[in-house]
Every structure is written in structure tokens, then in C-alpha cells.
Regions:
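Substrate-binding groove of N-acetylhexosamine-processing glycoside hydrolases
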Residues: 1-318
């Protein structure tokens, strides 16, 4: 036998549950155990580490590098040394935030490494949306890896419940936190919070659509879209100095694309519930009940597009 090496993911891309713009969601103690077993077996000649980028994954990469260079290193001790070096006087607050990040991570299956990266808060939502717009109530086999359920409604309910739990686990952003924390771990937790909130609403919209409640489904799809746009805006808001436009080509998870698909879903739901003439919902939203009962053959005002109708619904607080 000759030299041996490993191929290890600090981040990865699977169109399912991977992490690309956020740190590995499994705790560093998990990495410690895995790489400890590697070293125990003498596999230390060659390590290939997959990282989609460096900036979002700096802590994970630094920890792997430490183990590679110096051998087994306790995860807790490394975290403390890392936050002292990277965050300086805010080290204690940073350590708390990192531990909160790992504690909040959502498990989607029974195994220790069935931990959801931010792609889980995006890709299953897109799969469900696409399946709904194709029509029918049968399940989507693209989700069989995690939810091999017989109907689309059951898969949507499964995803809704997980996303609700995920959104609950992550804290709202603290605008008074140190800038470096806002640029890193706090930003990543906010991305999860927003995307999970959007995923839950997207699943609710699909369930309402399957039940024929198209107007409420349309509104929830609009709310979901706003959550994903807010996640993308959070990323872009932390671009400054040499990091300008850093997230502009965020294309592997592509949070903004989830928002685009939700706009398509809004159009689909409006067609189902308000087509082919597209005036009933507008009258229902803009008019008083008495006015809405008076129907003319001709239109007296322009049709609202989907986003304008959604904004009118928000104003009416439907």
C-alpha cells in the first residue's frame, strides 16, 4: 500500500441540503471525530478540501488546517483561540454566536450528519413549486431522498413543518452587534432564518393551492417571496470595502432565484383562481363588498399585475 489521502467537504453542492454561502452546519466536534479517525488510520499524506469559497467558510477551513498541520485538536479549544484571534475584544460574544449557530442547525433525518445547509431552505421549496405548477397531486420523486411520501400535499406538509422549526431556531439580527460579527456568523444565521420562513410560507401556499384556496395561496407565495428577497438583501448589505459585489454571483444556492420562482407560482395561482378574465380578485381587494357586487361588462381600470395586486392585499391586511 502506498500513500493515502482524503477528499473532505468544508462546503458542497448537492441541490438538496448542502451549504454553500454558510458554514458547515455540523458542529466542529463532528469534524474533530471524523478527521481524528482519518489520522488514526494513518491517512495523512494528502488531503483535498472542497470549499465553494473561502470567506463564508473561514472557521471550518482554519480548523481543518490546524488538524492537518498539528494533529488532533479539541474543537472547543480551537473555537476559543479562533474567536480571540479573529474577533479580538468581541471574542466572548463571537464564541456564543458560533455555538448558537451549531445548536440551531436543523436535522432533517435520523443520522448525525443529516444536518441542513442553506440549500435545504431553498432547493426543496423550488422542487415543490415546480411540481405544483406541473399539475396533479402526485408526489415529487426528486424529494424521495428525504421525503418518500405518496402525495405532494404530504411532502409539502413535511417541508412546512421542518421550515417552521428552522425559522424558530435562528435569532433575528442584532443591528448593534460588532460589524465583523454581522459580516459573518450573524449574517449566516439571518440567511437561514429568512429562508426557512420563506420555505414554510411556500409550502403553505402549495397546500392552500391544492385545497383550492387560491387567493390565500397567492398571498402566502408573495410573503414567501419577500422572505427570500430579504435573505438576498441581507447578503448584499454586508458587502463593503474589498467585499463589494461579493455576493452578486451567489449562484449555487441562488436565494434570489427562489424568489423568482415564487413570483411564477403567484402567477400560476392567480390563473387558477382568477382566470381567465382576472378581475374578481382585484375587485375583491380594492373595492368595498357593496362595490364588488356591481359587475360591469367592461373594465373601468387597468388590471393590476401580480406584484401590484399583492401590495394591495398587504395594504388591506388580508
Amino acid at each position: 500500500p502506498g500513500p493515502h489521502g482524503i477528499y473532505y467537504h468544508a462546503s458542497f453542492y448537492d441541490l438538496q441540503a448542502a451549504n454553500h454561502i454558510t458554514m458547515l452546519p455540523t458542529p466542529p466536534e463532528f469534524v474533530e471525530r471524523e478527521l481524528g479517525r482519518v489520522l488514526d488510520r494513518g491517512v495523512k499524506e494528502y488531503w483535498i478540501i472542497n470549499a465553494s469559497n473561502v470567506k463564508p467558510h473561514l472557521f471550518t477551513l482554519a480548523y481543518i488546517a490546524q488538524i492537518w498541520q498539528d494533529g488532533p485538536t479539541p474543537a472547543g479549544a480551537f473555537l476559543q483561540s479562533y474567536v480571540r484571534r479573529y474577533y479580538g475584544p468581541d471574542a466572548s460574544r463571537a464564541e456564543q454566536a458560533f455555538r448558537q449557530y451549531y445548536t440551531a442547525a436543523l436535522h432533517f433525518g435520523p443520522h448525525e450528519d443529516n444536518v441542513a445547509g442553506e440549500q435545504f431552505a431553498n432547493y426543496p421549496a423550488r422542487v415543490l413549486i415546480s411540481r405544483y405548477m406541473h399539475g396533479g397531486e402526485g408526489s415529487e420523486h426528486e424529494l424521495d431522498w428525504a421525503a418518500p411520501l405518496p402525495t405532494l400535499a404530504q411532502q409539502a406538509a413535511w417541508y412546512r413543518d421542518l421550515c417552521r422549526e428552522g425559522a424558530r431556531r435562528y435569532p433575528a439580527p442584532d443591528p448593534d452587534a460588532p460589524a465583523l460579527l454581522q459580516d459573518s456568523v450573524l449574517l449566516q444565521m439571518d440567511v437561514y432564518r429568512r429562508c426557512y420562513a420563506g420555505g414554510a410560507l411556500a409550502a403553505e401556499a402549495i397546500l392552500d393551492g391544492l385545497a383550492g384556496q387560491y387567493l390565500t395561496a397567492f398571498y402566502k407565495a408573495g410573503q414567501a417571496r419577500e422572505e427570500y428577497l430579504a435573505a438576498d438583501a441581507a447578503l448584499r448589505s454586508r458587502e463593503h470595502g474589498k467585499w463589494q459585489v461579493f455576493y452578486a454571483n451567489e449562484c449555487l444556492t441562488d436565494v434570489k432565484h427562489t424568489a423568482w420562482l415564487l413570483r411564477d407560482l403567484m402567477g400560476c395561482l392567480r390563473n387558477q383562481g382568477d382566470g381567465p378574465y382576472f378581475y374578481t380578485w382585484q375587485r375583491q381587494v380594492l373595492y368595498t363588498p357593496a362595490q364588488a357586487r356591481v359587475v360591469l361588462i367592461t373594465n373601468m381600470e387597468n388590471h393590476l399585475d401580480d406584484l401590484a395586486l399583492y401590495e394591495a392585499m398587504k395594504q388591506k391586511k388580508l
